[in-house]
Amino acid sequence: MSVAGTAVRINWQPRPDKAKLGLVEDGFEFSASDIHAGFLDRETLHRILAAQSAQNIETIRRAAEKTLLERCGDTVRLRGLVEFSNRCVCDCNYCGIRRSNRAVKRYTLSLAEIVECAQWCAAKGYGSLVLQAGERRDEKFAAFVAEAVRAIKAETCSTELPEGLGITLCVGEQSEATYARWFEAGAHRYLLRMESFKPALFAALHPREQTYAARREALATLKRLGYQVGTGVMIGLPGQSLDDLVDDLLAFRDLGVDMIGMGPYIPHVQAPLGGADQIGSAQARLGLSLRMIAAARLLLKNVNIAATTALQALSETGREQGLRFGANVIMPQVTPVRVRSQYTLYDGKPCLDDNAEQCCECLRKRIESVGRRVLYQAWGDSAHFAQRRALAKA
């Protein structure tokens, strides 16, 4: 279907008997035999996202999976997820832990608790973890994160991981000095989601003091400092079009991101974002999210893409489907169960009551059920990052 190391183009074949002017899906179908070296243009990306027929969707899925296997291999990278604090200074309109939500019981794990979670991940061979929290920008928080990163590195060194666990941070917008401080402490990946690359949609999701320009600048700063940079968007937002999602995909490409974490929009009952009555069904948002994963894989080839927990919130097999459509990262929960229910960004979050051991075994079975295998005792860094670093040196 495609050749390793080359781009992919999907040609469309008209179906004259069903062709209707102005409708993207009707009148076209994918032909697996006609995928060849080339590039994915805006029109093709739009048609991938618009696809509805089972035949077209399966062809897209198979092409994305083939690209993944050729460019990244068949392993799934695990990132133990430690949601270490739900205290947040931001007031995002879609978020369950927003500053104004007085119904949330706030918590912050102790340093010892965070290190214990990290040691558990290392013992299970995860190789990496994600430290995620609500946004804070005070010195106490910056110092605490730096101390946690250093402690994790010191306490998780082994023969297999001589530098300790790989660490991804997901703690929002910070100053360049703070980003540099954490990088020097030992964090080497950073996930900062845009939620939408359309300025008007970004503004609808965030309060006025959070600006589109500041978040774009933060992503550029992270890349300049040497982080592996990740971002992502929500899919199926009120007022969001397929053209907006195509713009998101092209923004991933133009920014040269190394990692993508995106998933379906799921409302939270205590968040004020309007338009919940305008969003598609759970099935429709799940399907569109899977096609976004496939489109990102076909467009970007060798980045790391997460099969997010939100996929499983809409379908029991959501994360497995994400893997089959081109994802290669899963973030199993290791947050202590006693606080996990207080970190709900959206309603219906799964795995709130399963302990880390249960999540570990469950995900291993899920991964193996789709013919993939877990990558143990390795950071599982983005192949895209290695490629761009090699190019920079050259």
Language-model regions: role of each:
Residues 99-115, 121-219, 228-235, 258-261:
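Core AdoMet radical
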Residues 174-182, 238-252, 313-324:
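Catalytic cores of alpha/beta
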Residues 73-113:
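Canonical Radical SAM [4Fe-4S] cluster-binding loop centered on the CxxxCxxC motif
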Residues 49, 79-82, 102-105, 129-142, ...:
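Glycine-rich, proline-tolerant flexible connector loops at the mouths of alpha/beta enzymes
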Residues 39-76:
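An N-cap/entry alpha-helix motif that binds or orients negatively charged groups
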Residues 1-54, 122, 253-394:
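Auxiliary Fe-S-binding modules of radical SAM enzymes
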Residues 129, 136-139, 164-170, 174, ...:
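Conserved strand-turn element in the central/C-terminal portion of the radical SAM core barrel
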